[in-house]
Amino acid sequence: MLTILHASDLQFGKPFRPRAGEAFRNLAFDVMPHLIVVSGDLTQRAKPREFKAAWDFLQRLPTVPLVVTPGNHDVPLYRIWERAVTPFWRWRHHIPRDVDSVVRVAGSMIVGLNSASPYRAIVNGRIQRHQLTFARKAFDETPPGGPRVLVVHHHFVSPPDGEGGAPLPGGRKILQKIEDMQVDVVLTGHIHQTFIASSRDVIPGDRAGVPLIHTGTTTSRRGRGPEHRKNSCNIVKVLEDTIEVTPHFFESRGSAFEPGEMVSVPRPGTPMKTAYPGTFPQED
């Protein structure tokens, strides 16, 4: 079994909610996962003090392997020269992780890909061919039966309410390659809503597709849709035949991340028994 604590869209800067940050830290120590994933947007405006605060925060979490990927907010928006010439300089200076990265944990292979695309998009992203080659080579080294996890910031499928902007361009072709790599689960953020989709939403088939697990904003005031004024993160457990996802929500007046309803989906390649659940149940 592989247990992952999945956060996203911390957005250190003006939107950051310190109480949510402290609640997430407490949850991390309660869970003590094998791995912590932060799928992009560590900062709000890619400023040095925001990157420093984000990394200081991550260093206060349990000392387990950490996967972080850039999001569109982690490249300069208004500093045009910097965006054009050295868009990831501040990331590389303050975050000691490559923008594309590989982490091995207890027989599992976790690959983080940078979907932020400062030259071609402001909000949306891109995944390039060389990045897919990078991921394939890493996954080819996975021990037999070991979980394969892919982390990107941008989403491949829109949430049920249609909010969140357009999915990644070329998503169908990318998801086909992800299926070919035998990836077990994709973890994303960006749209500030928690829900589960599947590569089967894009690519037809009679076997279970790759689960696409989205978490909302974990520590900012920018929750959207049903997560307005809420924060969220997921506990993801990769088991032999299934993947269990338990969303956790932090209310604006709360003091802790509280668990929602656990959802179990089949690992890719197994017979499909039920449709994917979409958004998680929300309590008012």
Predicted features along the sequence, with ranges:
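Conserved beta-sheet core of the metallophosphoesterase superfamily
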Residues: 163-239
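N-terminal active-site segment of His-dependent metallophosphoesterases
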Residues: 1-60, 78, 134, 141
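Active-site neighborhood of phospho(di)ester-bond hydrolases with catalytic His/Asp-centered motifs
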Residues: 7-8, 36-41, 65-72, 114, ...
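Beta-strand-turn-beta hairpins that frame and shape the catalytic cleft
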Residues: 1-5, 102-112, 143-147, 207-211, ...
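A short C-terminal boundary segment appended to hydrolase-like catalytic domains
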Residues: 237-284
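Extended active-site neighborhood of metal-dependent phosphoesterases/phosphodiesterases
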Residues: 52-134, 142, 177-179, 206, ...
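Active-site environment of divalent metal-dependent phosphoester hydrolases
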Residues: 13-15, 44-49, 53, 72-83, ...
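Short acidic, glycine-rich surface-loop motifs adjacent to enzyme active sites
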Residues: 139, 143-159
